[in-house]
Amino acid sequence: MKKLNRPRKLSFIEHRKAIQRLSRADDEAEVKRLLSSLWHQGGFEMNLERYNSGSKLWRVVDLPDQGRVVQDFSYPPKTEFCGIGRCNKAGQQVLYTSPNLGTCLSEMKGMAVGTQIRAGVWEAKSDFWCLNVSKHRNPVSKSGKLYSALQDLYDDIGDHHYLRTSVITDWFLGELSEDVSLNSELDGIQALRYPSTLRTTESDNFSNVVFHKNFVDSGGIKLSQWYHLEVSEAGETSCVVETKSLGFQSREGVSDDGNLVWSEGPRSSGAIIPPGATVKFTKNGENWIPDQPLETFS
């Protein structure tokens, strides 16, 4: 964990008012202006985390067929389907992931017996910095309290909040990453971690991680394993998910024509959930908790 503090030039009251204005801003230019002012005048204490190459994250696609190409596992999304989201502006391509498969399943609409889904494991191919706005601690410093107020924006539910959070995310991962003063301390910010809207515990595992287009397109993170899963048991408080087939990027997993290769056989060394294996999930509030460790990112 690295805390990046900016020398504060405004009074605490002035900063608090700026954050309040930011939480109400409904214009992209105004959001960017307020963010830039807060950054250059010392507005908040940033919680940054360094993750190593090899870190893995999950992405689930709620569609029944296996998936044929990498794009079928959420990246790059077709621009015509890129409506405004919590961390992307309309038409903007980003990669949404989660450290926890249970979080991905929790955000699906239903878990009925026979439901088939695609699950991809995305693996970082280089080290990267992640801005964490999912932590909810009791801040002590004034700059920490201001940062906490900024975090609260990512807890709000409803499309009308997305204008602010999508612009804020793009600003942190885009414009700010090109800031010379920032790059003197670290090599840009490639990802942002924010709380799942369905989180009912304080665990950071119930969070999502979004990656900027530049990092993904440059090969900073790639699809390394792909799964075809099926719900074999489902109830109000528990469910069981089984691997029907999977593939590996490192084992001739992509054919010459760019199609993914699937296997139902025993080649499972390195697989998080081998073929035929099952994982039971128990519900805690709105969150599905696996009965075995599946987290690959911490």
Residue spans for each PLM region:
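Beta-hairpin (beta-strand-turn-beta-strand) motif
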Residues: 63, 99-100
